[in-house]
Design a protein with these regions (language model features):
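Alpha-helical sensor/transducer elements of the RecA-like P-loop NTPase core
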Residues: 1-2, 29-36, 81-141, 151, ...
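A short hydrophobic beta-strand->loop->alpha-helix junction that borders the nucleotide-binding pocket
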Residues: 18-27, 108
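Hydrophobic alpha-helical core bundles mediating ligand binding, dimerization, or RNAP-core interactions
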Residues: 52, 176-180, 248, 264-267, ...
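A conserved switch/coupling segment of P-loop NTPase cores
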Residues: 4-15, 48-118
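Loop-to-helix "switch" segment enriched in basic
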Residues: 136-191
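C-terminal boundary/linker of central alpha/beta nucleotide-binding cores
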Residues: 3-4, 135, 139-140, 181-265, ...
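Short glycine-rich substrate-engagement loop in P-loop NTPases that contacts/grips substrate
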Residues: 39-50
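Extended alpha-helical scaffolding segments used for macromolecular assembly and cargo binding
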Residues: 190, 258-313
Length: 313
């Protein structure tokens, strides 16, 4: 949100426009192809980056947000290929191990002021390390009367939330994982299947019809999805489109399995039938491109190429 607000404020300074991309853990070529699709430049291997460098010219300086960066090696290769481009890059990440960039840490303001952001669960503030996501989830559980503050505090302590341990990933936050653990034990199989799909889908957000189809739950998913929403386990960035916070996704992925090939096939078939949905579904297409690259599946890569030609990109 801060990156979007910054882009809105500086927009007049960039004749080449302000552009936002969700990048995740995709490889450098997929990142390049994302920009090529947006800018209408060639996407073949040999012309991909030279064409982007020409597009990002001194005459058209461009502001580009690369949101939710995860793969340092892929990002380093991508940015190094475009180091001569006339673009201002804003990269958002929970952590960054790149040289050649300037780091601007962002901290929730009430944390630095020592104030309570969620009065209903104020006693949990220190226990949850002032983490806004964990506090929001705890507040949702308490406000929905799923559990009271005292019982939740006891659960967290019994789970070792106050212990010091090494984490395996920047999204491995014990205070959030424990809240997910509490909820998971109380969710029905349909709700768990919905969470599993959202945890393994690589696009930004998933339409309700796609979510129910991939989870194989049909209309039976409505009630469980509403419960997930009340408990703030899911996000609804657009009406009828659902996603997980990256930290919640990490906590769910470790306990679920989903056939990623089925997700790949679903979104290619969807866009082949409904090319008018490209704007909302484009990150799923980029995820399919990355899947085809990493699996070295020539047939699927050619299918994606035909789809892109149909879409006029």
């Amino acid at each position: 949100m801060l990156a979007c607000a910054l882009g809105h404020r500086v927009r007049p300074r960039f004749p080449g426009g302000v552009h936002w991309f969700r990048v995740g853990a995709w490889d450098a070529r997929t990142l390049g192809e994302m920009l090529a699709v947006r800018f209408g430049t060639p996407r073949d291997r040999h012309r991909l980056f030279p064409a982007l460098r020409r597009r990002l010219s001194p005459e058209r300086p461009t502001f580009i947000v690369l949101d939710n960066h995860e793969d340092d090696r892929a990002m380093a290769r991508f940015l190094d290929e475009l180091r001569s481009a006339h673009a201002t890059w804003i990269i958002t990440a929970r952590r960054c191990l790149l040289s050649g960039v300037s780091i601007f840490p962002v901290t929730a303001p009430l944390v630095t002021q020592g104030k309570v952001a969620f009065p209903r669960v104020a006693p949990l503030t220190g226990l949850l390390r002032h983490n806004p996501l964990a506090l929001d989830m705890a507040d949702a559980l308490v406000s929905s009367r799923a559990i009271d503050v005292r019982a939740l505090a006891r659960w967290l302590r019994e789970g070792g939330v106050d212990r010091v341990r090494a984490v395996s990933h920047e999204d491995d936050l014990p205070e959030v994982t424990l809240l997910v653990d509490w909820a998971w034990k109380r969710l029905d199989p349909v709700a768990r299947r919905l969470l599993a799909v959202l945890a393994h889908v690589s696009g930004d957000h998933t339409a309700e019809d796609s979510l129910f189809e991939l989870a194989k739950v049909g209309a039976a998913g409505m009630g469980p999805l509403e419960r997930l929403r009340r408990w703030h386990l899911v996000l609804e960035p657009f009406r009828g489109r659902w996603a997980l916070h990256a930290v919640v996704r990490f906590a769910i992925r470790g306990r679920t399995k989903v056939d990623e090939r089925r997700i790949f096939q679903h979104y290619l078939a969807l866009l082949e039938r409904h090319p008018e949905r490209f704007d909302l579904e484009q990150t799923h297409l980029f995820a399919a491109m990355d899947f085809a690259h990493t699996s070295s599946n020539l047939g699927q890569a050619l299918r994606i190429e035909r789809l892109l030609q149909t879409l006029g990109t």
